[in-house]
Amino acid sequence: EYPDFVPSSQAVSLPVENILQNPELPTGCESVALTMVLNYYGHRLAKTEIADRYLLKDPENFVTRFKGDPHDISGDGIYAPGLTETARRFLSEQNAPQKATDLTGTPLSELYPYLDRKIPVIVYDSVYLKTPVDVAEYVTDGETWHFYHNEHCIVLCGYDPLNRRVLVSDALSGLVWREERRFTEIYDARGRMAVVIL
């Protein structure tokens, strides 16, 4: 974090209002990140509405469902495929014009054009950019997915190419600039999971 950081004139910064996940959703970073983006598009969601009404849960599956309960500290999380479906469920119910798209596999630099078009991106990283630790796996459709201790999900809402920083709306830390190199390392290590709503 860089509290004294002053962005350059080349910086892009989207007005994504931050929502802190605690105390209601200690493991609900993904649903809070989705809520921030949906609210950016004019939906008026309370902090827990996505988690309570739209998130499908499962005791084992963290890929297409939320493993555990986001209201509980022992909950784990939900990966991009499941979060994309959660967004689609909400948007369909609202008859909203937007569509959710899973961009998993996209390099970080290729997400910047979305920001240029005023489209924030939900991105998976780690809590406070700590090194992810592989703690579980789940197989679905013949593909093995790994779950990591320190798993986290934030909204990428800006970047500063001159100073090599990215702006994130983090449900734990607030709105913060992060060093691009380290952020990219974690993003890549986590499988480059990203979701956009267009």
Describe the residue ranges of each PLM region:
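Active-site-adjacent structural segments surrounding the nucleophilic cysteine of cysteine proteases
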Residues: E1-R89, E93, V127-L129, D134-Y138, ...
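Extracytoplasmic/cell-surface-exposed regions of Actinobacterial cell-envelope-associated
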Residues: Y79, L83-S92, A100, P113, ...
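...with weaker cross-activation on analogous glycine-rich loops/strands in unrelated enzymes
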Residues: A87-R89, E93, L103-S126, K130
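A mature extracytoplasmic/lumenal domain signature
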Residues: A33, T104, D125-L129, G158-D160, ...
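Structural recognition of the beta-strand scaffold that forms the well-ordered cores
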Residues: G28, A100, P120-D125, V155, ...
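Noncatalytic regulatory segments and standalone regulatory/sensor domains
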Residues: A136-Y148, I154-L198
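A short acidic/basic microdomain associated with nuclease active sites
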Residues: N18-I19, K99-D102
